[in-house]
Amino acid sequence: MAAVKTLNPKAEVARAQAALAVNISAARGLQDVLRTNLGPKGTMKMLVSGAGDIKLTKDGNVLLHEMQIQHPTASLIAKVATAQDDITGDGTTSNVLIIGELLKQADLYISEGLHPRIITEGFEAAKEKALQFLEEVKVSREMDRETLIDVARTSLRTKVHAELADVLTEAVVDSILAIKKQDEPIDLFMIEIMEMKHKSETDTSLIRGLVLDHGARHPDMKKRVEDAYILTCNVSLEYEKTEVNSGFFYKSAEEREKLVKAERKFIEDRVKKIIELKRKVCGDSDKGFVVINQKGIDPFSLDALSKEGIVALRRAKRRNMERLTLACGGVALNSFDDLSPDCLGHAGLVYEYTLGEEKFTFIEKCNNPRSVTLLIKGPNKHTLTQIKDAVRDGLRAVKNAIDDGCVVPGAGAVEVAMAEALIKHKPSVKGRAQLGVQAFADALLIIPKVLAQNSGFDLQETLVKIQAEHSESGQLVGVDLNTGEPMVAAEVGVWDNYCVKKQLLHSCTVIATNILLVDEIMRAGMSSLKG
């Protein structure tokens, strides 16, 4: 009897073979759920929440976040897979598949009496060799627009249908190239993702500037200005109460009137400074002038600015203030004491767009913008959410490729070649740990197998063809999902991220090893002691 039973009779215990069987079945259960998602031909899943909200997705990360997973081992694998997505932006589904397959292959040997510890030693040896092989096959190349488009397309086609993926690919790559600075890390926060429930998903576009989700608050302000100066500020243009509790006693109405005037004058002086600057820089020309303020602007100030032909937007979001100066140039001001023409940014076109009851302000045609907006359009909420998730993954894929400075062939080509390299390496591993290396090699083949299966081809037949082609030509050959025949991934432009594959090998091996070495599962928390 388990020792914990003596201490706590209500504890649930699974030992040795039973514990392993529970863990392996959990991993395989999760693998079966995500199996059909893999690759461009993967199928969709419909998630219905408790409140009845529906989500359509084939993104493994979204699925694992939204699914309610009861089993502790399955939950552990899900956390590892979502962590993979948080770090590298891709590889969630592959992660779950490989962990499940590693455990399945190990189970075959364990059922024949091999100790899990020996298999895990084989896994470690195989991982070292696999990482070494990955270093050899990675393709270091100049990350030009063509290569980045191939990388983004490979990532996006696994999330959305091909036609939409091609539209998003261009937008995603151009947005990264717009914000990229020489020898500086890429900051993806400088790409605003704005949703608009309007038109169809293929109308999604890249705006080389900014889109704000509100409009001007005065009916007489211009709806469209061209060749505009942009003043970005965080200065209150409305009467605010003092920070300390102060009062004012007056004896007559005149004194009260004086106080009101003094309070107004304080704001009016600020507005006058803006108007003076506008007259100074615009003169008699018909150039536009736009004020974007993070704080409030009261109706009197709006009216005064409107009469001067100035467009004023109030209560802009804080995250957009930094993006504004990067997109248009200029400096964000916290006071008007040192207001000068040098503080102004510039945009070729600023216009307001009304959609139903919502208003959007577009700031476009900026010179050399360092912050851009991806405007996602779609007929309904499901489509918008799906595109948003896909775009985020696409951005990460392009960023990874630039950061790595190299890519690896996709379409299951790396896995097939890696499995063959491991089998050749097997004799150099001592003793029974060779079986662990064999199990690891077989487990990696789950990726090309599932890619072929999801495309409607016979998985064994396809795999044999690819392995034969790889052995003959020595090239990295993957699955052509349209014909089921072997193809040279590099020639077609199917590229995966190097860092995703590297992270996959590390995390899958660690988790599979840890799960195999569990020989007792105890559910004996405080809750089971009650009663």
UniProtKB/Swiss-Prot annotation:
Superkingdom in the source lineage: Eukaryota
Binding residue positions for ATP: 39, 91-93, 411-412, 496, 501
GO cellular component terms given for this protein: chaperonin-containing T-complex; cytoplasm; cytosol; extracellular exosome; microtubule
Keyword ATP-binding: yes
N-acetylalanine carried by residues: 2
Positions of modified residues (Phosphoserine): 205
Disulfide pairings: none
Residue sites binding Mg(2+) per the record: 90
Binding-site residues, ADP: 39, 91-94, 158-159, 411, 496
GO molecular function annotation: ATP binding; ATP hydrolysis activity; ATP-dependent protein folding chaperone; protein folding chaperone; RNA binding; unfolded protein binding; WD40-repeat domain binding
Pfam families: Cpn60_TCP1
Cross-link Glycyl lysine isopeptide (Lys-Gly) (interchain with G-Cter in SUMO2): where in chain: 251
InterPro entries named among the record's database cross-references: Chap_CCT_zeta (IPR012722), Chaperone_TCP-1 (IPR017998), Chaperonin_TCP-1_CS (IPR002194), Cpn60/GroEL/TCP-1 (IPR002423), GroEL-like_apical_dom_sf (IPR027409), GROEL-like_equatorial_sf (IPR027413), TCP-1-like_intermed_sf (IPR027410), TCP-1_chaperonin (IPR053374)
Gene Ontology biological-process entries: chaperone mediated protein folding independent of cofactor; chaperone-mediated protein folding; positive regulation of establishment of protein localization to telomere; positive regulation of protein localization to Cajal body; positive regulation of telomerase RNA localization to Cajal body; positive regulation of telomere maintenance via telomerase; protein folding; protein stabilization
Reactions accelerated catalytically: ATP + H2O = ADP + phosphate + H(+)
PANTHER family, sorted: CHAPERONIN (PTHR11353)
Illness association: De novo genetic variants in nearly every subunit of the TRiC complex, including CCT6A, have been found in individuals with a broad spectrum of brain malformations, and clinical phenotypes ranging from mild to severe epilepsy, developmental delay, intellectual disability, ataxia, and other features of cerebral malfunction.
Function according to Swiss-Prot or TrEMBL: Component of the chaperonin-containing T-complex (TRiC), a molecular chaperone complex that assists the folding of actin, tubulin and other proteins upon ATP hydrolysis. The TRiC complex mediates the folding of WRAP53/TCAB1, thereby regulating telomere maintenance.
Protein name: T-complex protein 1 subunit zeta
Species name: Homo sapiens
